[in-house]
Amino acid sequence: MGESEKISVGIIGASGYGGVQLVRLLQEHPLVDIVYLGGKGSAGQTYAEIYPHLGHAVDLTIEPIDTEAIASRCQVVFLGLPNGLACDIAPPLIAKGCKVLDLSADYRFKNLETYSSWYNKDRSDLDTAKTAVYGLPELYREEIKSASLIGCPGCYPTASLMALSPLLKQGLILPETTIIDAKSGTSGGGRQAKTHLLLAEAEGSFGAYGVAKHRHTPEIEQISSDLAGHEVKVQFTPHLIPMVRGILSTVYATLRDPGLVREDLLTIYSAFYRSSPFVKILPNGLYPQTKWACGTNLCYLGIETDPRTDRVIVLSAIDNLIKGQAGQAVQCLNIMMGWEETLGLPQLCFYP
Amino acid sequence: MGESEKISVGIIGASGYGGVQLVRLLQEHPLVDIVYLGGKGSAGQTYAEIYPHLGHAVDLTIEPIDTEAIASRCQVVFLGLPNGLACDIAPPLIAKGCKVLDLSADYRFKNLETYSSWYNKDRSDLDTAKTAVYGLPELYREEIKSASLIGCPGCYPTASLMALSPLLKQGLILPETTIIDAKSGTSGGGRQAKTHLLLAEAEGSFGAYGVAKHRHTPEIEQISSDLAGHEVKVQFTPHLIPMVRGILSTVYATLRDPGLVREDLLTIYSAFYRSSPFVKILPNGLYPQTKWACGTNLCYLGIETDPRTDRVIVLSAIDNLIKGQAGQAVQCLNIMMGWEETLGLPQLCFYP
Amino acid sequence: MGESEKISVGIIGASGYGGVQLVRLLQEHPLVDIVYLGGKGSAGQTYAEIYPHLGHAVDLTIEPIDTEAIASRCQVVFLGLPNGLACDIAPPLIAKGCKVLDLSADYRFKNLETYSSWYNKDRSDLDTAKTAVYGLPELYREEIKSASLIGCPGCYPTASLMALSPLLKQGLILPETTIIDAKSGTSGGGRQAKTHLLLAEAEGSFGAYGVAKHRHTPEIEQISSDLAGHEVKVQFTPHLIPMVRGILSTVYATLRDPGLVREDLLTIYSAFYRSSPFVKILPNGLYPQTKWACGTNLCYLGIETDPRTDRVIVLSAIDNLIKGQAGQAVQCLNIMMGWEETLGLPQLCFYP
Amino acid sequence: MGESEKISVGIIGASGYGGVQLVRLLQEHPLVDIVYLGGKGSAGQTYAEIYPHLGHAVDLTIEPIDTEAIASRCQVVFLGLPNGLACDIAPPLIAKGCKVLDLSADYRFKNLETYSSWYNKDRSDLDTAKTAVYGLPELYREEIKSASLIGCPGCYPTASLMALSPLLKQGLILPETTIIDAKSGTSGGGRQAKTHLLLAEAEGSFGAYGVAKHRHTPEIEQISSDLAGHEVKVQFTPHLIPMVRGILSTVYATLRDPGLVREDLLTIYSAFYRSSPFVKILPNGLYPQTKWACGTNLCYLGIETDPRTDRVIVLSAIDNLIKGQAGQAVQCLNIMMGWEETLGLPQLCFYP
């Protein structure tokens, strides 16, 4: 495929962790040219000033967010802004013919009332929002193919739904028994300086936050309900791990049929994810380490049943900034453009 | 109290992490003299050779494990050996009049068949085992007072039972819904060199192990059943955190009475632990960080209810090597000797 | 000694890391009552709101910085404020009869022009500054005894001067060959949220900063010159270690007499620090780990000579927040009050 | 270039960290097929048993080390064995026509007596050793082109020599003033379980080792002497950083001409490394973070002069397992084969 077939891409919110992952991945993507880096506070800075390690590879300056200019230069736009901003920027971009992939929560919800009640923001872009597709390719690959607007999933929902989906879709569990105990590296908190994310505070410590009220709960429930065909409520508890990258979700649910054993579930999961190149189901008795997924777009799944309690326990590991964010967005881009789904997406971590 | 009233104490298995915590704590305990350090592989080494940072404080050499010699010199003996060794050493020591506090699993079980089936070791010390008291002072303070043999709890059971006990004792939850998602620093794996505990392997990673089959499960179930008054089964999943010290247990259960709210439970927990100086119940909406407990014998508890799911979620943080091991043993010693329960036990961490 | 003999102490700047160490140490000091916590941004907050883990131990509220009120209630005042503020607060406190221990750089310099040129602040408190004593007890114990104002040393200078002093004092090295390659945990950067101190940025990374221009250079040189009896210039390079606490200084210098061997220097160092209870000189061939000093007021020194190059290499490890800051201030207090130098100061770390 | 032009490669010592980096890099190298994984203790295991995260990518079993079989199947062989083994394996492989790249110390020394005295091993392969080229492409690119046997540099020497070479080659410093204060992540210690490399021991700590006697000293001196044209002695001190990957070398030396300023040296370094695609010289006042190099074959250099002391300070950051080991070996392979030097070698890290 020739140089001329590359598409022009803009990244808005390029100075954050989502942004720098997108820059990193798209810089090496064979069919993409990054032509616009946009930001608010960082406008005017060269990218090398913000991320000196990329000085040799990226020779761009952050520009102000000007939808007119963006649309005139970009075929595809990634939005990596804080929640509540994309819903103002995406509509004009779409109207001007851009494809938009939004990494915030703004376009993840079918029901904007759910969004508004959890994110404290009223919305007037209902028509645009209706066209958005939830960007989890393993579940919505077909819809993504023809979408113009992708609401990329949150990091916790990605890890959790990868673990839960086969169980819900096939009706194998009692949905109301679902408990998701999730743990994330601190990069999930973003690059803004917050005291509790300082190394001096977070290193050598582990704790929960947002117990019974984290905003990823309704997102997980929306997709879970879609898969189950009826409303599902889950218990979701996030924790911070003293490390940079990675999420592990430990998912518990009671099996509808206590006769199911691990081997059965391995078969079911393998079938469910047969066409999903980034899902790696671990053999009998192996559980994933988050580090195995670091720097890749992979999701590792480990599955266990407990005959003493009739429960299934699924362990799901991803890199929160790649499969949980920027990599998944690129995966969606590949699908939207009709390219190989794995194009430009790493599958081998650097271990250790 | 005069110098002459100090008791003479031996620590067997002094070269491991349990051992060095005991040495550290007892070295500063006002009523204890360490007179015997025993070990197998390390016999003949000075303590400063094993732990150079203590060279200025501890001038003792590890001696072979000779029960005759130990009993002749020690009134109290702490055993910090691998599982399956204490059951050979404790009986002669007790027969010779020593009080024994065992940090291994050997004397935690009322039912030795349970022990044998989970620890693959047959036992012939039934008479001795029958006299052992489970060394969790917050639950068995009275029994500990008059005990000669203490089976000190495991680190995970300590954290988990502190969270669960008020709920089970008062019949507030449906016991079979109990899920314990526990996380520990790697020092819980001991000081023996194992590949998966290398910094290069464990740092920057998080994963589960022993899913549905960890040996702390029957221990938690034994005490839970005792508290509930009937057999209780729990789901217990341990994980390794990339840090040295600390355990967080996240405990989930369905409330029998969905009308109970957080404030009710805070009241119930405060009453339950009223006479327990090491338990700190956090006010509304605060959840513990493991680091707060590091270097102390404290257990911090945070409590939440979820009206959406009728569940209670309790978060319990301890230092796995102190409240989860050596500190708790010293707490038991204090109670056995009729001393102030907090004697020689730190209550203020060095933060950050 | 009776309760009535306790002194009343205030801590200004109590919300920072220096402050919380002082609170932690003085809370357990047998002859001190903390009666005033002062702060600027944090005034009005309870201490438990800032540091929840101390909620059970410290029942005080941060008050505004009012020198009148402070002096009326406190015999001794610790100042833990950013550089450039103590020089406005100390003079009125001293005038009203308080003893003052300042943890900032304001009173470390004999020559205020040196201070002004490195800290960009003009000073008008020359008379007060002249009375200040540099609070490194191992070098200035006699002067500290009768001082009313202590300029507590910086963390890097403490570690570095402990390593260098015997060499300079005895004229054993060529001073101009001195190179100090120092490394610190990130808590040295304080509790204010700065991007480069986020766990996500600092974890898993190591780098230098302030090369050839760090403000601790003139401080080290002032004391080095005082010891050598002539002006000394040193090369000082600080680095950030991905961990919370601890400093290691690696100090290099060319020996004046190449015939000196390690054993000679061990003897010289032992004699030099004979009356210094917190200095621990490691035997032949042992080098300190920063973790050995964590949570203690100790300084571990390891010494090596290289006959191939005629250099001496000294390794010095401290806890930057204790011996490098708050603990050293308490050590000075003990000396000023005529108490045992080690009172209330921990000497045993929790290892691992 | 067609599939048929790929070369067949063997990796001996594939289970260690050097081995797994080679597997990782060569698996994605467009002109290489891995056809043989060899090992001693690990022979018979599948690679997925040793490194489960690679189960989906590498379908090979470790075979015994049989030079006959290796030579019959491989054109190029990488040796990643402990020191002292390659010197028995390389000669027969070379005799049978293989090109050999050895990651151990065995072929780094021109003078085998130096090797023998530092590595305690007598050698009988003098003829083979004479043909070996030191595999630091930035210095010996021409010699590597035609070599059959490469002695790949140690990790510390790589970082240190990248910093030192322009200074030595151009005679800009007084060589005897050179001090190299080097710091490494713990993966440099390999995958064998050693107590001091446990996370519980190494995390949260920093210390020196091998002071004045580390085996990388003669290696650095050999190349330094070669560059300077006369014998050079350096002071080299390694330290362990509590992190997995990365080396920072802080190099000090006195300038021959004190008039030289940073800008001069930036110009000189840029010229020296003009044809070296992996060397990135940072602009004025920027110093490298090791994390910038992680997962890449890059070496970042930061340069400072100190007019107060007439010294130059150079900071050099690499990934110890890539540019410091496996990546550099692949870089040599590319040069030996006449391929693009950067082929298959990552240049963009995943930050943070």
Swiss-Prot record, chains A, B, C, D:
Q: Give this protein's Gene Ontology molecular function annotations.
A: N-acetyl-gamma-glutamyl-phosphate reductase activity; NAD binding; NADP+ binding
Q: Where in the cell is it found?
A: Cytoplasm
Top enzyme class, one word, equals oxidoreductase
The record's Gene Ontology biological-process terms are: L-arginine biosynthetic process
Offer a single GO CC term for the protein: cytoplasm
Q: Which domain of life is it from?
A: Bacteria
Q: What main location does UniProt list?
A: cytoplasm
**Which residues act catalytically here?**
155
Question: What pathway does the UniProt record associate with this protein?
Answer: Amino-acid biosynthesis; L-arginine biosynthesis; N(2)-acetyl-L-ornithine from L-glutamate: step 3/4
Q: What is its EC number?
A: 1.2.1.38
Catalytic reaction list: N-acetyl-L-glutamate 5-semialdehyde + phosphate + NADP(+) = N-acetyl-L-glutamyl 5-phosphate + NADPH + H(+)
Q: Which InterPro entries match?
A: AGPR_AS, AGPR_type-1, NAD(P)-bd_dom_sf, NAGSA_dehydrogenase, Semialdehyde_DH_NAD-bd
What SUPFAM superfamilies does its record include?
A: Glyceraldehyde-3-phosphate dehydrogenase-like, C-terminal domain (SSF55347), NAD(P)-binding Rossmann-fold domains (SSF51735)
| Keywords of this entry | Amino-acid biosynthesis, Arginine biosynthesis, Cytoplasm, NADP, Oxidoreductase
Functionally, this protein is described as follows:
Catalyzes the NADPH-dependent reduction of N-acetyl-5-glutamyl phosphate to yield N-acetyl-L-glutamate 5-semialdehyde.
Q: What family does this chain come from, according to its entry?
A: Belongs to the NAGSA dehydrogenase family. Type 1 subfamily.
User: HAMAP family, per this entry?
Assistant: ArgC_type1
Q: What is the official name of this protein in its record?
A: N-acetyl-gamma-glutamyl-phosphate reductase
Its source organism is Crocosphaera subtropica (strain ATCC 51142 / BH68) (Cyanothece sp. (strain ATCC 51142))
